[in-house]
Amino acid sequence: HVEIFFDPQTHTDRGIKFDTVINGIYKALKKAEKEFGLSFKIIMCFLRHLDEELGFKILEQASLHKDKIFGVGLDSSEQGNPPSKFEKLFKKAEEKNFVTVAHAGEEGPPEYIWEALNLLNVKRVDHGVQCLNDDKLVKKLRDSQIPLTVCPLSNVKLQVFKKLEEHNLKKMLNEKLMVMVNSDDPAYFGGYLNQNLIETQAALNLSKEEVKTLLVNSFKSSFLNEEKKSKW
C-alpha cells in the first residue's frame, strides 16, 4: 500500500493542465495495482510558499477528480509559511470531503504543529519532529495518537539534524508517539522507504521490536479501511 503526495501547482504554473498531471499519476498507480497488487491513496498538496487564494483554484480542479484524490496536504518551504495561512482553504477542502494532512514541525516550530491540529484539523502530521520541544504538545500527540510521518533522510538532507545519529526518532518512540518512517521525496533525499529504515536502524541502533513498532504504526496510520488493515 502506498499513499503518495503530488504538487499540481509545480506543473500547472508552467502550463501543464491539471487533468494531465492527475490522470498520468492515476494511470501509473492503477497499473501498479494490477501488476503488483499495490493499493494506493493520492493526496494533493498545496504549495505553502504561494498565496492561499491560488490554492482555491487548484482545489476546484481537484474537486472534479474526487474519485481519484483522497485528501489534501500542505508542503514546500515551512519557515514563514504557517498552517494558519491556509485555514480557510483547508476548511473548504473539508467541506468537499477531502481528508486533511499537513507538513508541520520539521523546520518550523512546535506552534506550527498546534496550528495544523487546531486550525487545519489534520488527521496526520507530516514530519512533526519539533514536537519534542513542547511538553504539552507531546502529551497531546501521545493521548490522541495522531500519526507523525517522520522522514529521517529528508531531515538530514535539510539539516534539521546534522547527521542521522542525532535524529530524535528513538526519543519519539520512547514517548509512545504514533511515529513511523517514510521516504518524503526519494529522488531528492536519497532513498525510498527501505533505505530510510535500514539507515535509521543502523544510525540509532533500533531494536527489532522498535523497527516492528514503526512498521505496525505505518499500517495503523494509513488511510486504508479497517477491513483491509486487518488483513495485515
Regions found by a protein language model. Give the residues of each.
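Short HxH-centered metal-ligating active-site micro-motif
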Residues: 103
